[in-house]
């Protein structure tokens, strides 16, 4: 209703001005033709640059080995690359390794960062301020300072080449950011809800689990997405900790197609597409919440 | 009654006062078991909730950090760390050598070269990414047909794991038969050694990192732009402000606080950006694109013999640099009256 009124009001103003014989004024938010063309041209170029490399990866994955570097969009359409990657390499093992690690990281990460976020948002307790500072500081920890000592520790406790080793490592990357984000998110949920829950006889855990968590779904989506992306796309720790063909994750596996010894670009493209698709699906699901989640986290950080 | 204090979000935000007050009981002289029990019974909910995170952080960040600092003061390398060969485990034989590693590193030109390039890399990436992100966000922050489609296309690079995109770029950059050179040669221009000429390699890694970083900037800035009330623009227009003036005096101040955060975050991320350089050039040609983190990784994991002590020392130096940066950034913000 309100918007309708405004539009009507603006239209009247324009008619009035035109009747006076002045040059036609643009309505607010309206652009000249040139500006409109410029806008679309710039956005088109930017969008093309953004989309092109992945798109090229996709079209190349359907070309036979001999045509990998041809310039044409389609040449000799074939699914051989996919067939080879899935059946003749350890790709499915790597995929399985990655899925296990990512699921564990996401589930544990989301759960412990939301309990922490909730405690930080609702309770005042000794150790709260140091904890908040630690969370903030660990976000800027370079992996370079941790990777060597972690490698030595993992090797001492036999955790190299074990998914568990990577899961705990990824938790430390994902959890500080997620906890911080969940805290900002819980801050936006009125305390009155907690209080009513307490009055009705729930203990704080019950309040958290039965009342607040269901309300926090958008926040949970963002943190889950972040943990997923962190674990799915991490390279350094995965490269250092996982060796031996059957232990690799996808990040390590993709590197085996193209290196000093082999140049199997055609297989690499097929594997890359298979890795990217799940990531895009998860992203597509989470991106609705991403903007609000991010800005809530960013402005309050 | 063992009820924890429920703070309103606003109060919890202030943090300082709340924590000070809550810490009260423990501050009393001697404390005593009674006070401890009281604190425990009041706060155990909260402590139970944060326990897993505290545990993980201490185990995987605190303890390795201490060990890393210690390792950097030793001569540990592949040959003398504790290791298992078959059923025999060989005990560690490395020794404490004090600050020697640091003296070596700081006296070596290689460190300063890498540092210089790391700074150039970080500043260039963040500045370009921010400029492009803000421009595109401004363009998308209005009504027109196809807005959603553009938005989806522009954030696509974010949806794909970075290491996958890096391989896509490596294919485009391929010197002999990559698409970029094939296009250039089609027009009669000599192909460019994208990844094996030091200067072009630097430009190439920056380009890929910008490509990867723009979507995050775009979404963050779009969020910031949408939080600026439209009335401000209306009022400015009434007063006859030009488009540039509206951008300069309404948009820029409006996105300031979000910008501060995302610039800080993206500086830290870029400074530590490992996969782009590691997978695109491996730091080459001849170390010309090696930033500090890739160099630290190379020392410990791809160099032969693997030099753990030096790598740990590089790691500690990187951490010190980041801490210095964060402190001065905060100072600079404070001076400008930003509460952060």
Regions found by a protein language model. Give the residues of each.
Chain B
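A structural signal for multi-pass alpha-helical bundles of membrane permease subunits
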Residues: 42-340
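Transmembrane alpha-helical segments of polytopic membrane transport and secretion proteins
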Residues: 1-50, 145-147, 330-340
């Amino acid at each position: 209703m309100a918007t309708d009124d405004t539009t009507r009001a603006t239209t009247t103003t324009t008619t009035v001005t035109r009747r006076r014989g002045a040059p036609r004024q643009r309505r607010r938010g309206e652009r000249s033709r040139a500006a409109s063309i410029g806008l679309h041209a710039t956005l088109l170029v930017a969008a093309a640059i953004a989309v092109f490399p992945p798109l090229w990866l996709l079209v190349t994955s359907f070309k036979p080995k001999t045509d990998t570097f041809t310039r044409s969009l389609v040449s000799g359409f074939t699914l051989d690359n996919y067939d080879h990657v899935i059946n003749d390499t350890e790709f499915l093992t790597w995929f399985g390794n990655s899925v296990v690690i990512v699921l564990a990281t996401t589930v544990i990460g989301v759960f412990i960062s939301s309990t922490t976020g909730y405690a930080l948002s609702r309770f005042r307790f000794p150790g709260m301020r140091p904890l908040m500072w630690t969370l903030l500081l660990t976000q800027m920890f370079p992996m370079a300072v941790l990777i060597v000592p972690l490698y030595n520790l993992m090797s001492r406790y036999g955790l190299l080449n074990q998914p568990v080793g990577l899961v705990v490592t990824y938790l430390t990357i994902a959890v500080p950011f997620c906890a911080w984000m969940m805290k900002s998110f819980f801050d936006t949920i009125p305390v009155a809800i907690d209080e009513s829950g307490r009055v009705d006889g729930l203990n704080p855990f019950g309040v958290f689990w039965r009342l607040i968590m269901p309300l926090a779904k958008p926040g949970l989506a963002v943190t889950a997405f972040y943990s997923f992306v962190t674990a799915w796309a991490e390279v350094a720790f995965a490269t250092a900790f996982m060796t031996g063909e059957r232990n690799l994750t996808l990040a390590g596996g993709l590197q085996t197609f193209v290196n000093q010894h082999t140049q199997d670009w055609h297989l690499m493209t097929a594997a890359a597409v298979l890795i990217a698709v799940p990531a895009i699906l998860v992203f597509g699901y989470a991106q609705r919440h991403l903007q609000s989640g991010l800005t809530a986290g960013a402005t309050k950080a | 009654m063992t009820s924890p204090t429920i703070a309103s979000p606003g109060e919890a935000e202030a943090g300082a006062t709340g924590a000070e007050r809550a810490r009260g009981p423990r501050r009393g002289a001697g404390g005593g078991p009674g006070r401890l029990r009281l604190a425990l019974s009041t706060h155990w909910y909260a402590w139970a909730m944060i326990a897993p995170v505290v545990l993980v952080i201490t185990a995987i960040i605190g303890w390795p950090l201490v060990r890393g600092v210690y390792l950097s003061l030793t001569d540990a390398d592949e040959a003398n760390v504790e290791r298992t060969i078959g059923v025999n485990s060989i005990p560690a034989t490395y020794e404490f050598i004090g600050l020697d590693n640091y003296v070596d590193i700081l006296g070596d030109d290689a460190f300063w070269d890498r540092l210089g390039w790391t700074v150039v890399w970080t500043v260039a990436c963040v500045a370009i990414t921010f400029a492009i992100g803000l421009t595109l966000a401004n363009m998308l922050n209005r009504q027109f047909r196809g807005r959603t489609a553009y938005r989806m296309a522009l954030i696509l690079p974010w949806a794909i794991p970075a290491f996958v995109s890096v391989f896509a770029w490596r294919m485009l950059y391929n010197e002999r038969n990559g698409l970029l050179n094939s296009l250039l040669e089609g027009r009669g221009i000599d192909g460019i050694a994208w990844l094996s000429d030091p200067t072009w390699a630097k430009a190439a890694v920056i380009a890929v990192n910008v490509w990867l970083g723009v979507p995050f900037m775009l979404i963050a800035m779009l969020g910031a732009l949408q939080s600026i009330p439209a009335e401000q623009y209306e009022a400015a227009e009434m007063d006859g402000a030009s488009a540039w003036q509206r951008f300069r005096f309404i948009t820029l101040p409006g996105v300031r606080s979000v910008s501060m955060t995302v610039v800080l975050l993206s500086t830290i991320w870029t400074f530590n950006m490992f996969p782009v350089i590691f997978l695109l050039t491996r730091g080459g040609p001849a170390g010309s694109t090696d930033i500090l983190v890739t160099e630290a990784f190379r020392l410990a994991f791809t160099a032969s013999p693997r030099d753990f002590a030096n790598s740990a020392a590089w790691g500690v130096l990187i951490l010190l640099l980041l801490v210095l940066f964060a402190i001065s950034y905060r100072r600079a913000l404070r001076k400008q009256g930003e509460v952060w």
